[in-house]
């Protein structure tokens, strides 16, 4: 298999191989139709420079600009003899349309594009806000695709987001090597009842646009640290203290306002996460959430609510616990795109009726855990058990 693209000698490795697939290209000589890509070179360069969000992450834009310096007109058909199947060129059955022409056009034809009578779907959803593609096919989406759209006088997508690859133990996945891992294999190996842990890891393992790596050890260490030790343990011990000292009940005098430092940190974290999401920085957004949970854990250790209760400072203890429970509500809402099942478990243990995944970040306000009994001893359970623990294996909880 290959990339089905034309390569100049300067595009090859020192050994004369395709840089993406490390295979020797096939030399073909035939008569084809061409698209005058060079005609749109300056327009594409201008568009990239005037619209810094067009190619994300930004360092990929520089790669595309360098490629544009040497851009040439491209063959957009193949002879029927060399390609046995495909869409015939209109008016010339001896030629088949080049795969990247019909593949790219699917983005708009699937929406019902028609130059004379475009569908309502096309008018509603095009131009796309963002097109997410792999870094190895960036040239086709950031050079060829804009040129085709310009030729048709169709608006360009607002952003092309190029993601990196996921390697396995620092090696590129390959069927020939036999190191391809399917998500269901991970779930079966670790006896996960839902995919949240794997989903979380895959979303946080690679900074925006960079490669990420999967290994069993990295997976276990990351999800145990973030989901079990940090977030899960924080909720569990706080709810247990709420039951132990206050019978699981929150009274009006326990509720804190948004002027306290933890509340300020919670609201600040919401804004940081939103800003990260706006820039498609998914892994970085998760780190903001983990940073906040670290802050809350430190707050618990510093204030020592168990000591406050022992000293008879019950109202002070209650306010500390309320701050932590409210923080957990914020953390669950922020984590919902990563761990929808775990976030919902947190919401249910906080006696919340709404769906965690439906919470709008703009509407997150401090002080919304209401007065009344929110839990009891029998209802408290770990939302995420450490992987490889005997309990995790037996309970098949993930």
Regions found by a protein language model. Name each.
Residues 1-3, 164-166, 218, 251-259, ...:
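A glycine-rich phosphate-binding loop feature that marks nucleotide/adenosyl-phosphate handling sites
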Residues 1-2, 8-12, 18-21, 275, ...:
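Basic, alpha-helical terminal appendages of large translation-related enzymes
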Residues 138, 202-209, 215-218, 241-252, ...:
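Active-site-proximal binding-pocket segments
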Residues 166-173, 225, 255-268, 351-364:
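Short, mixed-charge aromatic SLiMs
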């Amino acid at each position: 298999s290959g990339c089905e693209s034309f390569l100049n000698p300067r595009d090859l490795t020192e050994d004369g191989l395709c840089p993406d697939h490390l295979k020797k290209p096939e030399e073909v000589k035939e008569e084809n139709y061409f698209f005058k890509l060079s005609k749109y070179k300056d327009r594409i360069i201008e568009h990239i420079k005037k619209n810094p969000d067009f190619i994300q992450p930004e360092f990929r834009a520089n790669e595309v600009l360098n490629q544009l310096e040497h851009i040439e007109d491209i063959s957009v058909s193949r002879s029927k003899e060399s390609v046995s199947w495909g869409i015939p060129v209109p008016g010339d059955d001896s030629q088949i349309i080049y795969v990247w022409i019909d593949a790219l056009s699917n983005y708009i034809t699937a929406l019902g594009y028609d130059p004379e009578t475009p569908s309502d779907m096309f008018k509603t959803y095009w131009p796309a806000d963002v097109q997410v593609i792999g870094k190895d096919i960036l040239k086709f989406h950031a050079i060829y695709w804009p040129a085709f759209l310009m030729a048709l006088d169709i608006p360009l997508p607002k952003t092309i987001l190029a993601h990196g690859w996921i390697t396995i133990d620092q090696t590129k996945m390959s069927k020939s090597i036999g190191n391809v891992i399917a998500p269901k294999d991970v779930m079966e190996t670790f006896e996960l009842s839902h995919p949240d842990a794997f989903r979380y890891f895959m979303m946080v393992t690679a900074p925006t646009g960079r490669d990420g790596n999967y290994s069993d050890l990295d997976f276990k260490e990351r999800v145990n640290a973030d989901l079990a030790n940090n977030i899960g343990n924080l909720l569990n011990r706080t709810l247990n203290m709420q039951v132990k000292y206050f019978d699981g009940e929150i009274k009006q005098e326990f509720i804190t306002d948004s002027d306290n430092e933890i509340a300020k940190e919670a609201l600040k974290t919401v804004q940081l996460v939103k800003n990260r999401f706006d820039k498609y920085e998914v892994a970085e957004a998760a780190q903001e959430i983990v940073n906040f949970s670290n802050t809350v854990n430190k707050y618990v250790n510093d204030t020592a609510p168990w000591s406050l209760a022992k000293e008879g400072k019950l109202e002070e203890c209650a306010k500390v616990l309320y701050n932590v429970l409210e923080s957990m509500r914020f953390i669950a809402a922020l984590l919902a795109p990563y761990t929808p099942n775990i976030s919902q478990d947190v919401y249910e243990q906080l006696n919340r009726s709404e769906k965690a995944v439906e919470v709008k970040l703009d509407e997150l306000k401090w002080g919304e855990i209401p007065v009344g009994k929110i839990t009891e001893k029998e209802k408290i359970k770990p939302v995420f058990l450490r992987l490889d623990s005997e309990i995790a294996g037996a309970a098949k909880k993930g």
